[in-house]
């Protein structure tokens, strides 16, 4: 989620949170009225309950927009909502509907132009046939009269056709411009409504709906909707208008013949309807697979370092392949359905022509119809039938749009449907109660017999009949084992969930009756894993302040600085180049964990809440920062109700009330003193096993260590300052001056050969260059890929059949011209029956022509089936394989690629769908349509030249007009495609970011501002596309009117050729149909220009990604070499060395993180790395794991440079446990097995998984779960507590029995009992292996063989814990601040 980095502009002119543009408000009001039976037109607030999920109020009063996270049941309890194609237009405003109505009129007018042209074709045909009859009769007077009629008719009618062409240009241009504009606005309205709807979902909904799913729906699904209601819908209206007008013309000229041909259109529509209905099911399956795969992809990109650490890129890539495999089957099934449908369509059309010519001949023979009129009727039916065929070809677009709408709008409509239950009464009660608590309430909280189980696991209660009173204005600490329900209490207090039974009361008022926004506005929250947004530090802190838009910029700045000082963040912020205006990046990745935590604390403190919830608020801080921040929190806790969740009992020493939770409820409760002196008390036992051995040190100012490591660039590294403490009188700055980094030359020199470190091999972040042959090259690669099957054969068969279908059209032209000339002997102007023997000859020839048409109809039916089926299957295989290849290639790229702000996990997951969807337009059925059109043009031109080269060349010479217009439009569409993606990439990322941080968004009532900014960004994106829309519409109009202009030219010049004897009526009509309508097919090629533009763009981008991945792999293979470990078991001993390493993060090239760092860690030893937040500790681990490559220097394992060769060769001997545990959706056992060296987690023996679980002390947790290791984890493992997730992550690391174990605060999230057990397990498993632990809590490194103290990217102290403590230097100061002695 992105907000304005500098919010001062808004402060000068405060805006209401709910302000929107009129179109959006009207559209959302309209769809709300259409979906709700309530007659109350006033804005409605929502309240969550235990049984329903409130719907979003998408527009509001003058004060605010009310949107909440629901607390009710999941979607299973919501009513099913049917979504049709026309449901999409509920999200159009009245103004947009009126504009669409105008555009519809223009499309109807454009569609009527071609059938009206047939009136004049029939008139000219009568004159031409009359001239032919006169020539055959030899009557000079008749010849002169017919000659004069030819000239007179072609001059007047050609001019009329010219006027029709000009009118069609303006009509086509206007309808395309109108629908391009309104489709963009409606799509924006749907995106806005969808995000608003997600904000009203119960929190358990997001356990299954990840950011990848949101990206797929907003990016891909809404794009499908926009295509359906944009360019495709007005063209469908135009084709339908063509059909209706053509039918009217046909009936006007011969109702008998038209009546016989009348069933053709219903049969076409019936075939199309059945095909569309059957295809929709296939598309729904495909979209569902893509959404699930997108969620998995987003998960993988978010945890890319975990995947690389355990070399599981291939495993996740194969799983992604499996998740998307069903798209191939769905595509094949859709291909068979479409093949049968299109074959039936062509059979109906050509068999209809056979019937028309056969029955028309009977009417002519009886004198009931003139040959010229039959030409008008047949041409009109020809135009109408092919209009229906073109309309038929768009059914897929409308089917996909409807399927996408069912997915997106269905989600919105479910919430609207479930918001009708007594909302007025609930609103009234809620508002009254909130007013009673608005002034002077005590903030006492009571949990009364609360029973709760998460909706995803209803059989496993977390809280069982819990009764607890939390007194007002005191500090209550909740401690206990991981999974005992501590964090669940916080979720219930914020109304993320509702108790299954019992109640939670605030001053004796059930919180379910309170305005949820008001309630959350009274609470300040600091989470264990802080969430920051891609905005400035100041803007992030401001988010915690209610009514911030009503305050001046000066007041806001003052409050932000005060809050930052309280949170011990002011010094490091002011040291940054841009200070408080520094952008923190997506999810705050530009800051260290401790820096993010302090900003989160400042965000909570700035609102001066009545209730303060602290969930391990200092877990990510170093010892000095923790001491100061803890003192600040103790001060902030005064005169407010504060609840602390903590595993570190030293942080709850000053709590007034301590509650010890167990699996079955409260074990004991009391003050710290009371509980600590209980002889057999649980708390006393926990306290005895904590390593806090001395009293805490009082700190009155900030012991900050600030440097440039893993954080933003500093203007300078400030001298560290600390006030006098009880035991420390010297300053840290003095210590920093007295402690010098060790001489690198004195470090241990590892055995083995030394290798020069290569330059950094990170992937360049420059925009990919366009490949001029992108689509062709990509197809060549995929055709050779064995995973795509017999792709070449499918394309050959599909293209050959498409070419045959295209060649049928000129054959039809020959048959048509022959049949028309055969009518010439019976061309009577007085309506007399045709005399013999001309009648017998005409009927005989007609039977041959009609039979030929029927044979063509049967052949087309079979050939078109194979044409469509083959290309559908080929397109599905190509898009599936491309999606998998791009995903696997992205996983191969360096970690630095994913640090780039433009390569967020949401954008990358969304791009997989966008690229595959784009490529489908050039490799699926569209490719067959283009081959078909080209065959029609080539064969048609050849036939025309054979029948009359003079007329053919003149008409063919006009073809460049069509081609030029199409090419220009192609270029504009390519530019539009690029601009559209660029414009909406930011909005998609914002939506995904807000959903990924849904708890934070909800806790701080950020939904109104999120929606306001999102809606503004959507408007800006739409506005930037308008010029491109205009250019494209003008060129589209030109391409559409060319047909009429060329037809006018053909009649004018053809008439003269006929009059001068250079051609016959048969030759004229053969040339007319072959060339003029061949030119139309040439124009139709460019109707697919948008599809090919998207395909070409997608191919170029895909090739760029594949090329980058190939280069990374090739470089690794080129530098790879056999490694011979100098040990008995042929395994590395585990010696780690960094030699003169200098490193800067690729995204911060001006900031030195490690400055010529040298250190050596002996094999089999336990080495701890400590230091202030951002001193470079975690960076050392990431270099050892080869996530990054040093700028200079070497990183060695047993003397071998790990920066050379395949990183997996070295990583298989290492295990990595990050500070913030990352789990995947899947079973607990699968997550643990992911760390094994086996290629497939499914192949890991159960005993091995169980052994790793025992080492990580997971036995009790697994025993409490009905399914044990088979328990399914949701996305990111959100139903597990932080400690439980961390233990699973430790088990994942231990299962591979590593030679080098890397721990980044591995036990920071554990409760005391779990920490003690896991620490003991880590101590045991560290025997015989090299263990490197980054730690803030010095009690966890008491058994370390060696401690390295880092500052500003250098080693400042080194030795055993006891040696460093006795040295009374920086380490000793850190230990005393934590109350630890060695």
Curated annotation (Swiss-Prot):
Residue ranges annotated as transmembrane are 101-121, 159-179, 233-253, 259-279, 339-359, 374-394, 800-820, 848-868, 911-931, 951-973, 1034-1054, 1067-1087
| A GO BP entry | transmembrane transport
Write down the membrane topology: Multi-pass membrane protein
Detail which positions bind ATP: 480-487, 1171-1178
GO CC annotations? membrane; plasma membrane
Q: Which residues form a coiled coil?
A: none
Q: What induces it?
A: Expression is strongly induced under conditions of nitrogen starvation. Expression is positively regulated by the cluster-specific transcription factor rua1 that recognizes and binds to the specific 5'-T/G-G/T-C-G-C-A-T-A/T-C/T-C/T-G/A-3' upstream activating sequence found in all promoters of the UA biosynthesis genes.
Q: State the Gene Ontology terms under molecular function.
A: ABC-type transporter activity; ATP binding; ATP hydrolysis activity; ATPase-coupled transmembrane transporter activity
> ABC transmembrane type-1 domain location, by residue?
101-400, 797-1094
Q: Where is the ABC transporter domain?
A: 445-688, 1136-1377
Would the keyword Nuclease turn up in this protein's UniProt record? no
Enumerate the residue ranges of region (Disordered): 1-56, 738-768
Look up keyword Manganese and say if it applies. Answer: no
Chain intervals with Basic and acidic residues compositional bias: 1-12
Which residues does the record list as glycosylated? 62, 397, 680, 827, 903, 1020, 1324
Q: State the UniProt keywords alphabetically.
A: ATP-binding, Cell membrane, Glycoprotein, Membrane, Nucleotide-binding, Repeat, Transmembrane, Transmembrane helix, Transport
Instruction: Give one Pfam family.
Output: ABC_membrane
UniProt function note: ABC-type transporter; part of the gene cluster that mediates the biosynthesis of the glycolipid biosurfactant ustilagic acid (UA). UA is a secreted cellobiose glycolipid that is toxic for many microorganisms and confers biocontrol activity to U.maydis. Export of UA is presumably catalyzed by the ABC transporter atr1. Atr1 appears to be quite unspecific, as many of the UA derivatives produced by cluster mutant strains are readily exported.
Family, similarity comment:
Belongs to the ABC transporter superfamily. ABCB family. Multidrug resistance exporter (TC 3.A.1.201) subfamily.
Task: Please give the name of this protein.
Answer: ABC-type transporter atr1
Taxonomy, top ranks, is: Eukaryota, Fungi, Dikarya, Basidiomycota, Ustilaginomycotina
């Amino acid at each position: 989620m992105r907000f304005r980095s500098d919010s001062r502009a808004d402060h000068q002119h405060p805006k209401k949170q709910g302000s929107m543009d009129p179109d959006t408000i009207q559209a959302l009001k309209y769809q709300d009225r259409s979906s709700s039976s309530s007659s109350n037109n006033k804005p409605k607030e929502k309240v969550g309950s235990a049984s329903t999920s409130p719907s979003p109020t998408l527009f509001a009063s003058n004060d605010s927009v009310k949107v909440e996270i629901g607390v009710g049941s999941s979607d299973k309890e919501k009513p099913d909502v049917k979504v049709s194609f026309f449901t999409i237009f509920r999200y159009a405003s009245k103004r947009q509907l009126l504009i669409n109505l105008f555009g519809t009129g223009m499309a109807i007018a454009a569609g009527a132009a071609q059938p009206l042209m047939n009136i004049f074709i029939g008139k000219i045909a009568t004159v031409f046939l009359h001239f032919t009859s006169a020539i055959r009769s030899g009557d000079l007077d008749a010849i002169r009269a017919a000659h004069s009629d030819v000239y007179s008719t072609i001059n007047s009618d050609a001019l009329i056709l010219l006027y029709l062409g000009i009118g069609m240009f303006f009509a086509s241009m206007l309808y395309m411009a109108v629908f391009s504009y309104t489709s963009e606005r409606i799509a924006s309205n749907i995106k806005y409504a969808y995000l608003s709807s997600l904000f009203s979902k119960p929190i358990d909904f997001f356990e299954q709906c990840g950011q990848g799913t949101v990206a797929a729906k907003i990016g891909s699904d809404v794009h499908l909707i926009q295509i359906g209601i944009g360019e495709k819908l007005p063209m469908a209206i135009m084709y339908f208008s063509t059909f209706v007008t053509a039918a009217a013309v046909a009936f006007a000229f011969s109702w008998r013949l038209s009546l016989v041909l009348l069933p053709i259109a219903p049969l076409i529509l019936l075939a199309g309807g059945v095909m569309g209905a059957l295809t929709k099911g296939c598309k729904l399956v495909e979209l569902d697979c893509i959404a699930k795969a997108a969620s998995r992809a987003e998960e993988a990109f978010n945890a890319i370092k975990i995947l690389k650490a355990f070399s599981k890129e291939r495993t996740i890539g194969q799983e992604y392949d499996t998740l998307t495999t069903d798209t191939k089957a769905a595509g094949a099934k859709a291909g068979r359905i479409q093949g049968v449908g299109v074959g039936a369509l062509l059979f109906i059309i050509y068999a209809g022509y056979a019937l028309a010519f056969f029955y028309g001949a009977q009417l002519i023979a009886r004198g009931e119809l003139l040959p010229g009129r039959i030409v008008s009727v047949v041409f009109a039916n020809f135009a109408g039938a092919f209009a229906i065929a073109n309309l038929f070809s768009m059914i897929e677009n409308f089917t996909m749009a409807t399927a996408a709408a069912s997915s997106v709008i269905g989600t919105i409509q479910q919430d609207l449907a479930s918001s009708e239950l007594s909302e007025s009464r609930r609103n009234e009660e809620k508002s009254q109660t909130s007013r009673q608590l608005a002034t002077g309430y005590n903030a006492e909280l009571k949990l009364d017999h609360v029973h709760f189980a998460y909706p995803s696991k209803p059989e496993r209660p977390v809280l069982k009949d819990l009764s607890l009173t939390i007194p007002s204005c005191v500090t209550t600490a909740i401690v206990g084992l991981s999974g005992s329900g501590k964090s669940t209490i916080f979720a219930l207090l914020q109304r993320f969930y509702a108790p299954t039974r019992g109640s939670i009361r605030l001053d004796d008022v059930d919180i379910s009756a309170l305005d949820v926004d008001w309630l959350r506005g009274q609470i300040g929250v600091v989470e264990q894993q802080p969430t920051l947004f891609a905005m400035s530090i100041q803007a992030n802190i401001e988010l915690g302040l209610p009514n911030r838009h009503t305050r001046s910029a000066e007041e806001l700045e003052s409050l932000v600085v005060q809050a930052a000082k309280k949170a011990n963040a002011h010094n490091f912020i002011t040291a940054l180049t841009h200070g408080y205006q520094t952008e923190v990046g997506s999810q705050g990745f530009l800051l260290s964990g401790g820096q993010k935590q302090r900003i989160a604390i400042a965000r909570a403190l700035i609102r001066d809440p009545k209730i303060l919830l602290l969930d391990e608020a200092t877990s990510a801080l170093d010892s000095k920062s923790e001491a100061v921040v803890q003192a600040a929190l103790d001060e902030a806790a005064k005169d407010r109700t504060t609840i602390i969740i903590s595993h570190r009992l030293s942080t709850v020493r000053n709590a007034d009330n301590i509650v010890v939770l167990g699996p079955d409820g409260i074990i004991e409760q009391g003050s710290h003193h009371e509980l600590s002196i209980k002889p057999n008390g649980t708390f006393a036992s926990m306290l005895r096993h904590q390593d806090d051995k001395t009293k805490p040190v009082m700190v009155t100012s900030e012991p900050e260590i600030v440097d440039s490591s893993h954080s933003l660039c500093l203007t300078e590294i400030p001298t560290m300052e600390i006030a006098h403490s009880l035991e420390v009188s010297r300053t840290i700055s003095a210590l920093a001056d007295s402690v010098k980094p060790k001489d690198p030359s004195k470090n241990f020199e590892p055995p083995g050969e030394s290798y020069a470190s290569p330059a950094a091999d990170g992937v360049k972040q420059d925009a990919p260059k366009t490949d001029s042959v992108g689509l062709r090259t990509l197809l060549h690669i995929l055709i050779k890929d064995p995973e795509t099957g017999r792709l070449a054969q499918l394309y050959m068969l599909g293209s050959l059949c498409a070419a045959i279908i295209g060649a049928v059209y000129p054959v039809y032209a020959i048959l048509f011209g022959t049949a028309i000339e055969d009518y010439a002997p019976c061309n009577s102007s007085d309506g007399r029956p045709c005399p013999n023997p001309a009648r017998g000859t005409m009927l005989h020839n007609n039977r041959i022509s009609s039979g030929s048409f029927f044979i063509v109809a049967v052949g087309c039916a079979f050939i078109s089936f194979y044409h469509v089926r083959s290309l559908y299957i080929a397109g599905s295989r190509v898009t599936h394989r491309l999606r998998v290849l791009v995903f696997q290639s992205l996983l191969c790229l360096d970690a630095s690629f994913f640090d780039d702000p433009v390569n967020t996990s949401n954008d990358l997951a969304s791009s997989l769908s966008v690229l595959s969807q784009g490529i489908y337009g050039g490799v699926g059925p569209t490719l067959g349509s283009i081959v078909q059109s080209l065959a029609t043009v080539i064969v048609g031109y050849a036939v025309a030249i054979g029948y009359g080269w003079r007329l053919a060349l003149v008409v063919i010479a006009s073809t460049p007009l069509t081609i030029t217009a199409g090419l220009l439009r192609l270029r504009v569409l390519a530019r539009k495609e690029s601009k559209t993606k660029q414009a909406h990439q930011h909005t998609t990322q914002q939506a995904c970011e807000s959903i990924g941080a849904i708890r934070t968004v909800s806790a701080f009532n950020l939904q109104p501002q999120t929606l306001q900014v999102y809606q503004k960004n959507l408007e800006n994106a739409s506005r930037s596309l308008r010029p491109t829309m205009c250019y494209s519409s003008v060129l589209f109009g030109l391409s559409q009117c060319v047909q009429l202009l060329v037809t006018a030219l053909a009649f004018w010049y053809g008439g003269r050729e006929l009059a001068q004897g250079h051609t016959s009526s048969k030759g004229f009509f053969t040339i007319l149909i072959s060339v003029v309508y061949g030119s139309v097919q040439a124009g139709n090629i460019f109707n697919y220009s948008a599809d090919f533009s998207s395909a070409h763009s997608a191919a170029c981008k895909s090739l760029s990604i594949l090329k980058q991945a190939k280069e990374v792999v090739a470089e690794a293979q080129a530098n790879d070499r056999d490694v011979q470990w100098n040990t008995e078991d042929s395994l590395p001993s585990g010696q780690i060395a960094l030699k003169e390493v200098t490193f800067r993060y690729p995204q911060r090239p001006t900031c030195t993180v490690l400055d010529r760092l040298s250190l050596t860690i002996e094999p089999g030893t336990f080495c701890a790395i400590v230091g202030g937040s951002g001193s470079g500790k975690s960076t050392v681990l990431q270099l050892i794991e080869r996530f990054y490559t040093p700028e200079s220097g070497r990183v060695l394992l047993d003397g071998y440079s790990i920066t050379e060769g395949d990183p997996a060769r070295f990583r298989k001997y290492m295990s990595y446990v990050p500070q913030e545990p990352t789990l995947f959706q899947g079973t607990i056992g699968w997550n643990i097995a992911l760390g094994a060296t086996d290629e497939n987690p499914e192949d890991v023996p159960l005993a091995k998984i169980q052994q790793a679980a025992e080492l990580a002390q997971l036995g009790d947790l697994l025993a409490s779960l009905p399914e044990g290791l088979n328990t399914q984890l949701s996305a990111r493992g959100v139903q597990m507590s932080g400690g439980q997730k961390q233990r699973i992550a430790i088990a994942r690391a231990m299962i591979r029995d590593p030679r080098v174990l890397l721990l980044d605060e591995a036990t920071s999230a554990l409760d005391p009992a779990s920490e003690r057990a896991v620490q003991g397990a880590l101590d045991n498993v560290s025997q015989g292996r090299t263990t490197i632990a980054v730690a803030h809590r010095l009690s966890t490194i008491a058994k370390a063989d060696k401690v390295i103290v880092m500052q500003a990217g250098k080693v400042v102290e080194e030795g055993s814990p006891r040696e460093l403590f006795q040295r009374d230097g920086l380490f000793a100061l850190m230990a005393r601040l934590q109350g630890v002695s060695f």
